[in-house]
Amino acid sequence: MSAAMRERFDRFLHEKNCMTDLLAKLEAKTGVNRSFIALGVIGLVALYLVFGYGASLLCNLIGFGYPAYISIKAIESPNKEDDTQWLTYWVVYGVFSIAEFFSDIFLSWFPFYYMLKCGFLLWCMAPSPSNGAELLYKRIIRPFFLKHESQVDSVVKDLKDKAKETADAITKEAKKATVNLLGEEKKST
């Protein structure tokens, strides 16, 4: 690990949060430097993602759990920059999930797939301005969206109109059925 990365990693491990508090307690009880403990945990998780049962679930929990928590905090904060950062992550996560749905049957057979997927998701949620989600959104998703926006808007409008027509027709039929049922009930009494 380069000196700059090691220093940044150590700074990250000394920030105040529940995980670093737990690391501090472990460090105090064992006498082992918290960076070694963290690297050990990372190594165990990586091994589990390669060989463990339920690696898919663990990977999805990592890709969903922390971002969901931070997204809720971002919604509750007055700052809107963090909202944009996490909305970008969720757009990329959604696109990735759809692509993965069609390719997962093949990819899940590769031994390092879930470890690589987890690394990809961690890269997408990295706390830096040029993280994976930002990069993929700006270079791939946004240009594609802008190119096809009017067509997608048209399809969405058509679907919305058809859904409204269907809901109105079902409501109308339900009202008729209710009136008929009540009318038959009055006749029988």
From Swiss-Prot:
GO cellular component, one term: endoplasmic reticulum tubular network
Disulfide-bonded cysteines: none
Lumenal side: 52-53, 104-105
Assigned keywords, A-Z: Endoplasmic reticulum, Membrane, Sarcoplasmic reticulum, Transmembrane, Transmembrane helix
Lipid bilayer topology: Multi-pass membrane protein
Sequence ranges on the Cytoplasmic membrane side: 1-34, 75-84, 124-189
Subcellular location: Endoplasmic reticulum membrane; Sarcoplasmic reticulum membrane
BP terms from Gene Ontology: endoplasmic reticulum membrane organization
Main location: endoplasmic reticulum
Membrane spanning residue stretches: 35-51, 54-74, 85-103, 106-123
One Pfam entry name: TB2_DP1_HVA22
Chain residue ranges for the region called Required for dimerization and maintaining endoplasmic reticulum morphology: 114-185
Known partners and oligomeric status: Monomer (heart, ventricle). Homodimer (atria, kidney, intestine); maybe disulfide-linked. Homotrimer (heart, ventricle, skeletal muscle, liver). Interacts with ATL1. Interacts with ATL2. Interacts with ATL3. Interacts with CKAP4. Interacts with RTN4. Interacts with ZFYVE27.
Family the entry assigns: Belongs to the DP1 family.
Function noted in UniProt: Plays an essential role in heart function and development by regulating the organization and function of the sarcoplasmic reticulum in cardiomyocytes.
Name used for this protein in its record: Receptor expression-enhancing protein 5
Organism for this UniProt entry: Pongo abelii (Sumatran orangutan)
Higher taxonomy: Eukaryota, Metazoa, Chordata, Craniata, Vertebrata
